[in-house]
Regions:
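Short, conserved beta-strand segments of beta-strand-rich sandwich/propeller modules, principally
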Residues: 265-267
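Mature catalytic domains of secreted/periplasmic carbohydrate-active enzymes
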Residues: 1-238, 243-258, 269-272, 276-280, ...
Length: 288
């Protein structure tokens, strides 16, 4: 197929290293409806392969749209083992489950948010077409919004790239991807302060001095599952703890902005959890 899929390495960086040899089969079915016949062949020769968005089996969950975003909250757990199958697509509220998952689900089916890079100005191109130009490429601001509403909501962001007839990604697309990576690193590469904790429901950060802050990032150690059910982030302003953000799902990564506050100390307060919290990362940033 004349298409490449690029998954955000920042979302599943550790998971991919922990599970070498795991590959992915996209979900498009054979034109004759023979897609399910591929499954036993794949299972025989690549038993660790994951299926994505296939009508017979989907180990990875489509987030419900091709906008590059998912809803919030977004849980990685799900009530049945495949997000799509002929047996479950008729389930009540199926589309809601795709977007949000189920905090009490018994199966680990993380969400993917997909979008073509060339989806701007009324275009939505998963494949290269004659006459294509850079005007179809999403602006950087749109891509950053997608990042925060996918990776920042506990999903993997998957971006469709379109090789041209020479078999290469167009130069304009490459430049935009480079700009995107640089902007992600600029915003979130150097936290003002960061920490981790095990078993604590209050996790504090000291910035050393009063500074403006307008973003936070939380990560759970998902080898222990998603344990947090509700939390808040507080800033100590004029000696008083003030709530600057509240949320529910965290999972692999939660990134959110809030109106800038100037403070020296911040803390994460876990209001509800299913077991002791495993905080892999709690950090704050100032993005301008």
């Amino acid at each position: 197929a004349n298409m490449l899929m690029l998954s955000s390495s920042l979302q599943q960086e550790n998971e991919s290293q922990e599970h070498p040899g795991v590959h992915q089969v996209p979900g498009a079915d054979d034109p004759k409806g023979l897609g399910p016949d591929v499954e036993p062949i794949v299972n025989k020769y690549q038993p660790n392969c994951l299926f994505y968005h296939n009508v017979n089996r989907a180990d990875l969950r489509w987030g419900g749209s091709e906008s590059g975003t998912v809803g919030y909250p977004c849980w990685s757990s799900f009530p049945y083992p495949y997000s799509h199958s002929n047996a479950t697509d008729g389930v009540t509220d199926h589309n809601k489950l795709l977007a949000h998952g189920d905090p009490n689900g018994k199966f680990w089916v993380p969400a993917m948010a997909d979008t073509p890079l060339r989806g701007y100005n009324g275009r939505h191109e998963w494949f290269w077409e004659p006459g294509d130009d850079d005007k179809a490429v999403y602006p950087l601001a749109n891509l950053m919004e997608m990042y925060e509403k996918s990776v920042g909501r506990n999903a993997t962001l998957m971006v469709g790239l379109t090789p041209n007839p020479d078999g290469v990604i167009p130069e304009g697309d490459v430049r935009r991807l480079q700009e995107w990576g640089a902007e992600i690193n600029r915003r979130f590469g150097q936290p003002l302060a960061a920490t981790s904790a095990t078993g604590k429901k209050k996790v504090s950060l000291s910035l050393g001095k009063v500074q403006p802050v307008n973003y936070y990032l939380i990560q759970e150690d998902i080898t222990g599952g998603e344990r947090i059910r509700a939390y808040r982030v507080e800033a100590q302003v004029n000696g008083k703890w003030t709530t600057v953000a509240k949320g529910t799902s965290v999972g692999h990564k939660r990134i959110e902005s809030f109106p800038a506050v100037e403070a020296k100390s911040f803390r994460l307060v876990v209001e509800e959890c299913t077991a002791e919290p495993l905080i892999r990362n709690f950090s704050v940033y100032h993005v301008n």
